[in-house]
């Protein structure tokens, strides 16, 4: 393949080589518009055409566009020149799960987390008629938050690839992870073949080695055909039972994903995950509301009294600085940035803070206290232009009147506007007196404030 371009269509800077295969190389890239990190898969057209794999490339594109899930590597766009095809995909900073397993077996709770995310992704793909057919740790990537991402759909199949008997017939996958019915070159169900591979992955995560391994390939196939494997002594009984059902050589009696989710080991991990999330949410609430709740004094860990941080106040000059004139713009202005939203509230600061924490929890947003009256709100899932983050800051105009500004810090502006309009506005209705842009209420608000400020 010829030398890589340093810039791709003036949209992406192309950096270091991340990996390569027979027909493609993957490079680190960065968007010139958003500064977002991406991976750029460069495929040699001539090589692909020469061996008749053009349909496979088209299928991979179709599959990745269908399989949009938090635990599946996202395809951002596809471009082509005379000699190359470019996939711009999600960059997974953590690399392959294989590299982590190569260092030894994982702790059970860590293995459960990855297995849970793998099953979630595979179940979603199956619901969209997509079968991966090459599930292995080398094709499971980790993002910078240590979340698993299923990648490499080059050997995947769509439901319309089945023959009249309703089965798939192409032998695909890596030998050590392939189901017996695939090796036997008989028709097979894509769902059951993927479940077998997931079972092998689970074994590898917990054991640190393969369940079926032999220097002689035919002997390894024999072991796979008979499900001839032994679980190490440190495997929990619930794990052993689940693995025996996933690595059932009879695909007709092999466990389904629905039953995997009902298994005791899967549910036990889910229960622990729920408890951990609840603990984190409580911690977030404590961090967000303490010690700012009522504006009174609090105590530190030693029982000593201390003054809580105070909200930023707005004087007449601050209000004018926020404005485009001396009218109601003292609070909002007729022209405002699409990346900012403001509302006025007649509720005390403690009630506004409590409501922000409650709404963040309902909308599954992370919330962190940044300072006096300043909170960082963050979406868990990465959006089109990265993770959406916002600052919510409370300003005191008078003791009974506050201005709250919600400003986008990162992410997609359209996504921010949609969140504000469809989620935040309805959820915050109890504490809002007027939102920026609601003219009639703004005028009434201005009259009320002027009345309060007139000398007696």
Curated annotation (Swiss-Prot):
Name of this protein: CBL-interacting serine/threonine-protein kinase 2
What Enzyme Commission number does this protein have?
A: 2.7.11.1
Q: What residues does ATP bind to?
A: 18-26, 41
Query: Which domain of life, per UniProt?
Result: Eukaryota
Query: What does the record give as cofactor?
Result: Mn(2+)
Q: Per its database record, what is this protein's job?
A: CIPK serine-threonine protein kinases interact with CBL proteins. Binding of a CBL protein to the regulatory NAF domain of CIPK protein lead to the activation of the kinase in a calcium-dependent manner.
Q: What is the originating organism of this protein?
A: Arabidopsis thaliana
Tell me which residues bear Phosphoserine: 156
């Amino acid at each position: 393949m010829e030398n890589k371009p340093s810039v791709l269509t003036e949209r992406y800077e192309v950096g270091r080589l991340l990996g390569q295969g027979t027909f493609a190389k993957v490079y680190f890239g960065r968007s010139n518009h958003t500064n977002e990190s991406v991976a750029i898969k460069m495929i040699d057209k001539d090589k692909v055409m020469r061996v008749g794999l053009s349909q496979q490339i088209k299928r991979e594109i179709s599959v990745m566009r269908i399989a949009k899930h938090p635990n599946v590597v996202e395809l951002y766009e596809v471009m082509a020149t005379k000699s190359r095809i470019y996939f711009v995909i999600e960059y997974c900073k953590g690399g392959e799960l294989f590299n982590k397993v190569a260092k030894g077996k994982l702790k059970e709770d860590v293995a459960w987390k990855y297995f849970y995310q793998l099953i979630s992704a595979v179940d979603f793909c199956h619901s969209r008629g997509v079968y991966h057919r090459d599930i292995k740790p080398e094709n499971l990537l980790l993002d910078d938050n240590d979340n698993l991402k299923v990648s490499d759909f080059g050997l995947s199949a769509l439901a319309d690839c089945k023959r009249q008997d309703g089965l798939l017939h192409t032998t695909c996958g890596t030998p050590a992870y392939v189901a017996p019915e695939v090796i036997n070159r008989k028709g097979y169900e894509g769902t059951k073949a993927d479940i077998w591979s997931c079972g092998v992955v689970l074994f590898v995560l917990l054991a640190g080695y393969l369940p079926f391994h032999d220097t002689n390939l035919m002997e390894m196939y024999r072991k796979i055909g008979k499900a001839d494997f032994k679980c190490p002594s440190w495997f929990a009984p619930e794990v052993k039972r689940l693995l025996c059902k996933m690595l059932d050589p009879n695909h007709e009696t092999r466990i389904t994903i629905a039953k995997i989710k009902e298994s005791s080991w899967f549910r036990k991990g889910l229960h622990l995950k729920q408890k951990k999330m609840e603990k984190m949410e409580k911690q977030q609430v404590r961090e967000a509301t303490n010690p700012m709740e009522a504006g009174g004094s609090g105590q530190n860990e030693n029982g000593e009294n201390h003054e809580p941080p105070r909200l930023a106040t707005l004087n007449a000059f601050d209000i004018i600085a926020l404005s485009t004139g001396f009218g109601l713009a003292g609070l909002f202005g007729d022209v405002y940035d699409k990346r900012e939203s403001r509302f006025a509230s007649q509720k005390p600061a403690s009630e506004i803070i409590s409501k922000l924490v409650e709404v963040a929890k309902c909308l599954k947003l992370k919330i962190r206290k940044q300072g006096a009256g300043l909170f960082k709100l963050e979406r868990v899932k990465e959006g089109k232009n990265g993770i959406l983050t916002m600052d919510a800051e409370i300003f005191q105009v008078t003791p009974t009147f506050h201005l709250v500004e919600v400003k986008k810090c990162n992410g997609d502006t359209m996504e921010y506007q949609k969140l504000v309009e469809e989620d935040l506005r309805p959820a915050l209705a109890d504490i809002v007196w007027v939102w920026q842009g609601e003219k009639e209420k703004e005028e009434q608000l201005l009259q009320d404030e002027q009345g309060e400020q007139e000398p007696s």
